[in-house]
Regions:
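Beta1/beta-strand and adjacent pyrophosphate-binding region of the FAD-binding site
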Residues: 2-15
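Conserved N-terminal/central alpha/beta ligand/cofactor-binding core
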Residues: 4, 21-22, 26-133
């Protein structure tokens, strides 16, 4: 099993999946190293991309964040479009300054699609491990 990675992402929630995907795209496997350069650690890989009790994507703040992530090549918005079961415009009667869209996603399908997408991502290894600490040597991660 490979143990040498340039980037190790701990956790497969929203931030972890985006970080792992972005790092895998940026660190193209051209350095001569064999194998992926990015690892995503999750105690249970079947829970990667699993949504909280509220499977909503959007709203004033989160909607803006998702749009910015999408503009940077992220996958959260794409996966939301694939798995949405209801769309709604929020604050429609209050004017354009506070109007926002929100999608309700199928929780199980969202996680399934996210896992499938990341599994196919070149340069990314998904590993079923726990990070119990970070080893440093002379002030650097070793």
């Amino acid at each position: 099993m490979q143990t040498d990675f340039d980037v190790i992402v701990i956790g497969g929630g929203h931030a972890g999946t985006e970080a792992a995907h972005a790092a895998a795209k940026i660190l193209a496997p051209t350095s001569g190293k064999a194998g992926p350069r990015v690892a995503l650690l999750s105690l249970n890989p079947d829970r990667i991309g699993f949504m909280s009790c509220n499977p909503a994507m959007g709203g004033l703040a989160k909607g803006q964040l998702i749009k910015e992530i999408d503009a940077l090549g992220g996958i959260m918005g794409i996966n939301t479009d694939k798995t949405a079961i209801q769309y709604r415009i929020l604050n429609a009667s209050k004017g354009p300054a506070v109007r926002s869209s929100r999608a309700q996603c199928d929780k199980a399908l969202y996680a399934q699609e996210m896992q499938a997408f990341l599994t196919k991502t070149e340069n990314l290894a998904i590993l079923p491990f726990e990070a119990a600490g970070i080893l440093t040597e002379n002030g650097k991660v070793s």
